[in-house]
UniProtKB/Swiss-Prot annotation:
<feature type="binding site">
    <location>
        <position position="259"/>
    </location>
    <ligand>
        <name>S-adenosyl-L-methionine</name>
    </ligand>
</feature>
<dbReference type="InterPro" id="IPR002877">
    <property type="entry name" value="RNA_MeTrfase_FtsJ_dom"/>
</dbReference>
<feature type="binding site">
    <location>
        <position position="239"/>
    </location>
    <ligand>
        <name>S-adenosyl-L-methionine</name>
    </ligand>
</feature>
<dbReference type="GO" id="GO:0008757">
    <property type="term" value="F:S-adenosylmethionine-dependent methyltransferase activity"/>
</dbReference>
<keyword id="KW-0963">Cytoplasm</keyword>
<protein>
    <recommendedName>
        <fullName>Ribosomal RNA large subunit methyltransferase M</fullName>
        <ecNumber>2.1.1.186</ecNumber>
    </recommendedName>
</protein>
<feature type="binding site">
    <location>
        <position position="276"/>
    </location>
    <ligand>
        <name>S-adenosyl-L-methionine</name>
    </ligand>
</feature>
<dbReference type="Pfam" id="PF01728">
    <property type="entry name" value="FtsJ"/>
</dbReference>
<dbReference type="Pfam" id="PF18125">
    <property type="entry name" value="RlmM_FDX"/>
</dbReference>
<keyword id="KW-0949">S-adenosyl-L-methionine</keyword>
<dbReference type="GO" id="GO:0032259">
    <property type="term" value="P:methylation"/>
</dbReference>
<dbReference type="InterPro" id="IPR011224">
    <property type="entry name" value="rRNA_MeTrfase_M"/>
</dbReference>
<comment type="function">
    <text>Catalyzes the 2'-O-methylation at nucleotide C2498 in 23S rRNA.</text>
</comment>
<keyword id="KW-0489">Methyltransferase</keyword>
<dbReference type="InterPro" id="IPR040739">
    <property type="entry name" value="RlmM_FDX"/>
</dbReference>
<dbReference type="InterPro" id="IPR048646">
    <property type="entry name" value="RlmM_THUMP-like"/>
</dbReference>
<feature type="active site" description="Proton acceptor">
    <location>
        <position position="305"/>
    </location>
</feature>
Length: 360
């Protein structure tokens, strides 16, 4: 296959494109990007046939900031006949054998989502045809490749596959989370998604456990504090603004009316530091660096608000600088990762884990 198809948020195509160009170059794979503003996807077309599979295998999806999902794809199938869309798709997937799952998807745009009802109905007969051809196993198998059929317009689709160990578990790379009725704000979904994304499911019980101490900088009205409280943590909520009364009534929250940039925790036995403040990203990064150098927390999740242009370059520079500063100050054992999550807007979410080599 010659294309790498990447799902992203509409409006972030240039950032996703810039990132995949850099990552492909690191693997000495040549190609060029094809995308349009607000399409919510990017195509990286390789110069050499077969290189798309190399990218899909060797670039970790989790290491990409702006891509929600990716798969190796054939050239765009155009003009799929209404009377038989299935045959051309089955033919295009002839080189795929014994895949474990089928996903018929669209980009995350209002225009493309108008096809979602069709995609649901189309999945059933397409699945049967792919099973008959041998491209798809009779029973779903989470260890086998995933077939993707992405309709970008009526009668037009990219088809291909992703590897199950390097693929989002969600259709279109989008987790479907519901906001709780008593959550103080919709921002609560950002931290909920961040915990799901950055902390492996099998480690959540030990790394997000009841009784832990946490600090929320810029907490008002308590959207992020809510996620910490519902996991049984005790939270120092730092903000000059008011906190949600329901959270205060739990007895798990102590409200410090202070500036998050000036606050120093009275006790340093903090497991989680979280921060979602509307501030220059470099200033937030410097704040987290200071806390890390002082050894005041074990793990942190924080948001970096993005500029209007050159967002990939800005984030990359900030993360590289953070790594350099931490190492210069004796913090050597850490991991850092960033993702433009579905519930993020003009921001990216960063996870910094100190001493990740130690068992939890």
């Amino acid at each position: 296959m010659i294309n790498l198809f990447l799902f992203c948020r509409a409006g972030y195509e240039k950032d996703c494109a810039a990132e995949i160009q850099v990552r492909a170059a690191e693997l000495d794979i040549g190609g060029f990007v094809k995308t349009n503003t607000n399409d919510a996807y990017v195509i990286f077309q390789c110069f050499q046939a077969g290189d798309a599979e190399v990218l899909a295998k060797n670039i970790s999806l989790d290491s990409l900031i702006f891509a929600r999902q990716m798969f190796a794809a054939k050239e765009l199938l155009k003009g799929l006949p209404e009377q038989d869309r299935i045959s051309p798709i089955v033919e295009a997937l002839a080189q795929v054998h014994k895949a474990g799952e089928l996903r018929v998807e669209t980009p995350d745009t209002n225009e493309a989502k108008e096809l979602s009802n069709f995609c649901r109905k189309f999945t059933v007969p397409l699945r049967q045809a792919l099973k008959k051809s041998g491209a798809l196993l009779e029973k779903e198998n989470p260890k086998r490749p995933i077939i993707h059929v992405c309709f970008v317009a009526s009668g037009q689709a990219y088809v291909g596959f992703s590897l199950s160990n390097n693929s989002s578990p969600y259709f279109m790379g989008i987790p479907r989370l519901k906001i709780a009725a008593d959550a103080p704000s919709r921002s609560t979904l950002k931290l909920d998604e961040a915990f799901i994304h950055f902390i492996p499911k099998e480690e959540q019980e030990t790394r997000l456990s009841s009784g832990m101490k946490a600090v929320d900088l810029g907490a008002c009205p308590g959207g992020w504090t809510y996620q910490l409280v519902r996991r049984g943590m005790f939270v120092a909520a730092v903000d000059n603004g008011p906190m949600d009364q329901g959270l205060m009534d739990t007895g798990q929250v102590k409200h410090y009316q202070a500036d998050g940039f000036r606050f120093e925790p009275p006790r340093k036995n903090i497991t989680w530091l979280v921060c979602d403040m509307i501030e220059k990203p470099s200033r937030v990064a410097e704040l987290i660096e200071a806390w890390a150098i002082n050894g005041w927390f074990k793990e942190s999740i924080f948001n970096l608000k993005l500029p209007m242009k050159a967002r990939y370059k800005e984030v990359s520079t900030i993360l590289a600088t953070m790594e350099e500063i931490l190492k210069e100050n004796g913090v050597d054992d850490f991991s850092i990762a960033a993702k433009h999550l579905y519930h993020d807007r003009d921001e990216v979410t960063v996870h910094l884990c100190l001493r990740p080599s130690q068992p939890w």
